[in-house]
Amino acid sequence: MRKIPRTMSTQHPDNAKVPEWNQGEAISGENEIIEAYLAFSRYGVEEVMWDAEGKDVDTHVVRKLLSQYPEFFRHRILGKDIFLTYRVPNPKIEGAERKVFAETLNTIPITYDLAEKFYGENPNPPVFEVILPFTTSYEELIAVIKFYEKVIVNSDNTKLVDDTYVKDIIGETNPKKIEVIPLIEDRDSMLRIDTIVGKYIEIERPPYLRVFLARSDPAMNYGLLSAVLSVKYALSRLSKMEKIYGVKIFPLLGVGSLPFRGHFSPYNVENTLNEYRGIYTFTVQSAFKYDYEDDLVISAIKKVNGTNVTEKIELSEEDEEIISNVTRKYTQGYQNKIEALADVINKVALLLPRRRARKLHIGLFGYSRSTGKVTLPRAISFVGSLYTIGIPPEIIGLSSLSKMTDQELNAIFNNYKYLKNDLQFAARFVNFEALQLLKDIWNIDAEVVKAIKEDIDYAENSLGIRIGESDYMSKKHVLLSTLALLSIKEGKLDEAKTYIKEMAIVRRAIG
């Protein structure tokens, strides 16, 4: 059995600070090669995600890593000890990126040839897995592996002229097969994960399967509680599928540093491991790496790598049904408020620091994220916007718990172990003065502000969460939030950007 990595470095642009080796405010181009190397060598991460989704990507990454850092990669074998995993665009959803999907898969045999030259005959393929975002059906997964086999590998035997075949021109194509990792990003797909993962296993019978569960996008689209509980539901179903099909399943979880996006920070590693039992691989995003002291980051990653994976969560069918109902109920109260704040969120998002040279992801070229009836920025900008206006997104929707039954509340507290811990972190940054400024600057309806205050009241009075803290950093963040909003009100956007960046540094993440 191959090694399954415990940590995966990603290129998510959630870092408030820029690492010292990067020139400029955004990480791009050659610096992403340096970043991948440092993830392995400095931080001890076991896998790097190479992201071709929604951004320009260097398809020569393996060539550059092996040629620029030969000593390191001779001792740590790519594809055996450490791993590089492509995240490809989903051609079904991202129409403008279809050819990028094909281009990325076509580089896999090139990486094999490079490894053969570097390591010798029959090397471990340096790239043999791809992550498929927005997976909603088993057919999408099968299409990826069949595209690789039929279009790329089988083209070896295509006759060109007389006795000349494709393989005579470009050489034999290896590896012969690739593995696909479904990335499940929406609540409904998590709640019917059997029809995606189960059906795929039934048809393809893989020796094992890695399944990637998102935390950020479900939180943005359905609210914090719905996201956490959907993941717990999916983990329970995966545990049962392992037994049904006799195939080992290794779940990955896409987590950021702030509670809304997973609360996987160097300070909270222990809690995250306990919260998400059965997860094999956690994403180490940019804020984790660059907004904390290096020694803290390195020791946290070492801890995760060295911790044994606990048994997967397995719920009774009754509990699964209750959780499914809770996620739908919670979403309704959450989405109504987000729809009312969408215009503000989108405007404030434009003022946040840019940390990656991403291509446009709103409009024609790429995608934005839709919640209910509105379009929102990507999850990091969404979270950053709400923290900026003094309404941490973790709080939004909480008052809907007052309408839950005792059975439903028990399901929430039993299955979201660190709910209060996560809410307490976020509640430090609530800014009451900002609620009034929302009405003054953007004419937000008084009923919406009242509904958000109800969420805050529920957190304080029913859950015992302290709103606001007296420590220096919490008070500084609240003050900066007020200054940022006053700057926007006066049209002083450059000043607002300065305050917004300072706030991100205080909370150690953009969003």
Curated annotation (Swiss-Prot):
It comes from the Archaea. GO terms for biological process: carbon fixation; oxaloacetate metabolic process; tricarboxylic acid cycle. Allosterically inhibited by L-aspartate and L-malate. PEPC activity is not affected by allosteric activators of E.coli PEPC such as glucose 6-phosphate, fructose 1,6-bisphosphate, and acetyl coenzyme A. Its EC number is 4.1.1.31. Optimum temperature is 90 degrees Celsius. Is extremely thermostable. No loss of activity is observed after incubation for 2 hours at 80 degrees Celsius. The times required for 50% loss of activity are about 60 minutes at 90 degrees Celsius, 10 minutes at 95 degrees Celsius, and 1 minute at 100 degrees Celsius. Its cofactor is Mg(2+). One of its GO terms (molecular function) is phosphoenolpyruvate carboxylase activity. Keywords: Allosteric enzyme, Carbon dioxide fixation, Lyase, Magnesium. Disulfide bonds: none annotated. The keyword Phosphoprotein does not apply. InterPro entries: PEP_COase_arc-type (IPR007566), Pyrv/PenolPyrv_kinase-like_dom (IPR015813). It catalyses: oxaloacetate + phosphate = phosphoenolpyruvate + hydrogencarbonate. Mg(2+) cannot be replaced by Mn(2+). Catalyzes the irreversible beta-carboxylation of phosphoenolpyruvate (PEP) to form oxaloacetate (OAA), a four-carbon dicarboxylic acid source for the tricarboxylic acid cycle. Homotetramer. Belongs to the PEPCase type 2 family. This is Phosphoenolpyruvate carboxylase. It comes from Sulfolobus acidocaldarius (strain ATCC 33909 / DSM 639 / JCM 8929 / NBRC 15157 / NCIMB 11770).
